[in-house]
């Protein structure tokens, strides 16, 4: 149970970085867990000699699902260019920052107005490189990225770990004609009737697992119909592998993770801001009650 919640919480489990969890999770993976993740949720589970990754594709795109430290589209484009560059490198290959910059500029030319001699664009690249190091896609063999951020003449020697090939999603069909994220959400038109039923099942499980809530505004909503009709079966699966409580109300459903399996950012936390927020909410509720009673 805790193994799946950790796979939900973390992008991937890298063996060199977290050896204990890597082997613990690897030992826990059985055919039943694989069937739940692939057949019902529709996610791919990668287990290699370097990492374990649950490819958590959402049913719907939401702002909180992005890379939180990234602040512009250009930073995502620089990350994509970095992934393209690393894809052509053998595992363990070393390269200099100047070589990387030269190749990224070639890759990105014609797609965006990015000049890596400009302070803002170079700062964006440094942010992307720091992210790649934290994600274990790159290792710094020599030099300092902070020094290179302040002085463009400074070099950094990087090593390609080979993990970048598992970072992006491998889609089952071409996405070359897609123009925005809605195209990924509306792929159901590509499937047969039987496949559409499977896609609906996957979508409901994904919404419950990755979103704080699942809403609908029509009695004809197919996802809600499936959820209500199959609620006992869905709850049984989620309780077995994740642990929690499925609450269904008029127009909304919530999957509440049990206290023992809570992951991610939670409220209230031990920080003082949590106590302040609780006090403010209590005061607001008192004021609302006073206003209502005075009517």
Describe the function of each predicted region.
Residues 259, 267-269, 292:
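A charged, low-hydrophobicity C-terminal interaction/regulatory region common to genome-maintenance complexes
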Residues 15-27, 102-123, 134, 217-224, ...:
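Short helix-coil junctions and helix-kink-helix linkers
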Residues 9, 73-94, 274-294:
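Positively charged, polyanion-binding regions of nucleic-acid-associated proteins
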Residues 1-68, 129, 144-265:
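Eukaryotic partner-binding/assembly regions in large regulatory complexes
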Residues 46-60, 74-80, 101-106:
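A short glycine/small-residue-enriched secondary-structure motif
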Residues 64-75, 266-273:
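Extended Gly/Ser/Thr-rich low-complexity repeat segments
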Residues 53, 67-75, 115-119, 123, ...:
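Intrinsic, low-complexity N-terminal interaction/targeting segments
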Residues 84-162:
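Internal, well-ordered domain-core segments that constitute the primary functional module
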